[in-house]
Amino acid sequence: MIKKIGVLTSGGDAPGMNAAIRGVVRAALTEGLEVMGIYDGYLGLYEDRMVQLDRYSVSDMINRGGTFLGSARFPEFRDENIRAVAIENLKKRGIDALVVIGGDGSYMGAKRLTEIGFPCIGLPGTIDNDIKGTDYTIGYFTALGTVVEAIDRLRDTSSSHQRISIVEVMGRYCGDLTLAAAIAGGCEFIVVPEVEFNREDLVAEIKAGIAKGKKHAIVAITEHMCDVDELAHFIEKETGRETRATVLGHIQRGGSPVPYDRILASRMGAYAIDLLLEGHGGRCVGIQNEQLVHHDIIDAIENMKRPFKSDWMECAKKLY
């Protein structure tokens, strides 16, 4: 029977992580469980840096960006000896189960703990929206608003100078954030990992737009696709139009979470406690068609596929 749980945030931070922690803590306390907060993700778990959390520990947290528990990347957690120390720390603290909030790297850590018999629940916290088994991740909608606002501002100056602007958006190897922001921001061209990219084809499309009378354009591109400064230089050379690249960077991860992210995080946090009390471990939480769902975390990582929104891409092309 579960009496005490731990909660940690891991990997890149996302707006709404604090709301998720709050959801976990308050739901657990309501059910009579104790909660230990673990600082700095798996690193803090390995180093045994924890704190007991009560209702007041998470007061005034629902609207705050970032994560008050801190986060860190800790690739050393792949080492079974490191994980053995982490498990020993959990047992020493009397922790019976763990809630992990983060992206796919965080899920891998939870998967490894699950494989050696420690109950874990994963909550999808990442702006990339690249987690399998869920329509949306905690932080995605806040980041989307941040990116669209940046695109709106870039359009103002691009229009003034009749310039081509390239905006690089986070997402790692998933184009969801780029695609949604590009549609909402009215971008003329979209470059995402799921669709084959050729810079000569992009230039041809830009030239076609210029021939139709377009005075400026915005190209939205997912990070890691190419060097955007080099791409800007190439476009300017081929089109004769001034072209500048803007890398939005970590500003996309910050800021107060929008209402949907707060609600999603709160619901998922409370749902994680429901699952643990029902005897579920080794699960990851998602939302599909606005209904909370849970999947086997090992199956989700190893077997599930995340479909690309090809219909969104087709829509975007019609709006160029």
Curated annotation (Swiss-Prot):
Annotated substrate binding lies at T126, I127, D128, R163, M170, G171, R172, E223, R244, H250, I251, Q252, R253
Give one Pfam family: PFK
Which reactions does this protein catalyse?
Answer: beta-D-fructose 6-phosphate + ATP = beta-D-fructose 1,6-bisphosphate + ADP + H(+)
Where is the protein found, in the record's own terms?
Cytoplasm
Key word Hydrolase present: no
Residues reported to bind Mg(2+): D104
What are the catalytic residues?
A: D128
Q: Describe, as the record does, how this protein assembles with itself and its partners.
A: Homotetramer.
**Chain's role:** Catalyzes the phosphorylation of D-fructose 6-phosphate to fructose 1,6-bisphosphate by ATP, the first committing step of glycolysis.
Specify the protein name. ATP-dependent 6-phosphofructokinase
* Species in which this protein is naturally found: Salmonella gallinarum (strain 287/91 / NCTC 13346)
Q: What is the lineage of its organism?
A: Bacteria, Pseudomonadati, Pseudomonadota, Gammaproteobacteria, Enterobacterales
